[in-house]
Amino acid sequence: MSSHITLIKTNTNNENKMTQFNYKVDNDVMIIRAMVNNVAKQMTPVWPLEKFIACNALHGFESMSFEEAVIQNQTAKKGTPFNEKLERVNWHMIKWCGSFLDIGQGTLEMPHRDKGLYFGFLKLAPFDSALHQNSKSIKSWLSNLPEMPEQAIRLCLDNLGVLNQKQEDFLQSTLSHLPGWAGYIKWISEWKNRNGKEENPVSLVDFIAVRLVITCILWPEASQEEKKKKKDSADTKQLIQNIKNKEDNYRQLLLKKLLPELSKAHIKENRANAQMVFCIDVRSEPFRRCIEKLGHYETLGFAGFFGLPVSIKDYDGETIKDSCPVLLKPRFNIHEKAIAANEHCIEHHEKGKEFKNILNRVYQQLKYNFSTPFALVESLGIWCGITMFLKSCSPIFARRLTKDLNEMICPSIQTQPVFELDLLEKEVGISLQEQIAYAEMALRLMGLTDNFAKLVIFCGHGSSTQNNPYASALDCGACGGNQGGKNAQLLASILNKIIVRRALAENGINIPQDTLFYGAQHDTTTDEVEIYHSNVSQFIHQDILAQLRTDLNMAKYNNNLERINYLNSIDCAEKDIARRSTDWSETRPEWGLARNAAFIVAPRQLTKNINLEGRCFLHSYDWSQDKDGTLLETILTAPMVVAQWINTQYLFSTIDNVAYGSGSKITHNVAGKIGVMQGNASDLMHGLPLQSVMSHDEQSFHEPQRLLTVVYAPREIISELVEKHDVLKTLFFNEWVHLVAIDPRNHLFYKLEKTNTWSVIQ
């Protein structure tokens, strides 16, 4: 085992041989890195719980057709028999990954983390008796491993007897045994660590090196066992056929609903009392229907980050959150300040916040100290027992009581974004020119360039749940798994500036002087809508605003009635939904984006009179204002791609919740504050929980089918855009997404074929 190390030592006296050896080592390093990069392409990144992002579980296979990718992955997973030695390797790998990647849950921190996973393993593995079983030869081998992970991979591949032509496949198989942990490491190295700055650096090269070292010790015949997999694709082919049948039925039903509405697509309405711009999220669709029925209101759909690639630091927060799609890199840093009306309680708020921080620090120190946890339980046990009783028996009352106590100690204050460019600290804020540019692009993308109402509400969204590790999965995906109200508030603040409006007028967007913009947030769990600063505003239209608040409450009630039918509850709708948002034992506070099926890019008039059952992403778009297709290009290459990620996550979590989901919430354990495991040692679960897609163990609630994109625009414009972008060719021609065009000139439906030709749908 140590021949490679010995070779390094015995050749130090021969300069020519040393040069040749160094060249060989460097060449090996490059070859290993190239192989790892190749196999990593098929790995799907796994985002941490705090910013849980929907992602296609087979993202790395999108270069294949949908059918080929599913067959290859499903048959491979079903063809892997139980292997006790493999399970032992997995157990040790989980132990090392959990220790290294922990971000504050563990009491003791793993040493040497700042030097990387492999380096830390190299220094500590000789002391791991569970791994080497006190074998002197294995301990000696561990102590003499190469310092570079690439060299360790080469050494282990040779020891395992993996043939050169099989090495890349073997490395692929090595990653596939723990795709969750490997995917999380890929996220760190390729998404989180975009600037190369990481406190505890880690890469898939480290991961593979550590795993292969463990494999050499515990499963030396691994390369032979990998050849014994059996594959059977018959069940998978039937699964794909069932998906196709659902897709065909849904497409016929949707197009049948749209057909009688085509003549209304370009009808211009009179000036509305209020316009509300919601996220394209499928949960917005039923609420939009409810509010439109209650008054002269117009609603629009737009990506929930409102076109602003920003990072936002909360008023009370110590961290900065990226509030834009993960496909984008934030360009601007924004922070918050208290509004003038809250000046009287700022001091009280700051003192209360400091008091709570002190209590929290003391509690954490007592809880995680070696000697004090028992004393902590003895002293706080009765109070914790009372709290547990209230949370379990009366969650709504417990939530209200907690909120009232928090208000007494640390009163909440309303804030506003600070977004003007700081001339001294140019990393903070947005320049005036960029404010104008982003405001114009947002208005044009949502089709709001004229006929402005007196009130325009930009409505982001978020959720409210208790004891839910997957809370961020219910928040706004377009905001990177964060709540979208702050983005809405920021865009409203920009558009309320007179200088911005004047610049927009020069570019053809005339906003009336009596138009006022507000930011708001829609709670998708309870359907409450909070309009920011509406109670302290000194502007006009208070009568319209008061009526809008009343109608929003009624829309909440009506939508609760509609949603409760899907939640299988016999209680009062409003009461039960309020309970779900506060009950810490509730495994299904809401259905999230389950049953999503279509992405419609069209004027609201086309869908306004249709009950789409909360299954459609709705993006407002008027092709007559976009003759060159520039706006449509942005919609198809950004929000539609995000919708496809969401759709495929729900699809694969439904068809195989063990392989692509995360199993039942009941047996979840949070691991290192980064993800969840099933039980005390499993792969890092990387999909949706069973309760997010299944009514019960044998009945799915989500209907697994690929995304159907419907675009109301001329076919030739769409064809040009598809040919222009590889991502669109991949998604449409490999049939990960279906595309239907509604030609506004003849009102016929056309389906895009693999050859970039169109066939009429009868």
UniProtKB/Swiss-Prot annotation:
Zn(2+) binds at residues 279, 281, 461, 476. The keyword Cell membrane applies. Its cofactor is Zn(2+). It is found in: Cell inner membrane. Its main location: membrane. Keywords: Cell inner membrane, Cell membrane, Membrane, Metal-binding, Transport, Zinc. The keyword Metal-binding applies. InterPro entries: DabA. Pfam families: DabA. GO terms for cellular component: plasma membrane. It is a peripheral membrane protein. GO terms for molecular function: zinc ion binding. Part of an energy-coupled inorganic carbon pump. Forms a complex with DabB. Belongs to the inorganic carbon transporter (TC 9.A.2) DabA family. This is Probable inorganic carbon transporter subunit DabA. It comes from Legionella pneumophila (strain Lens).
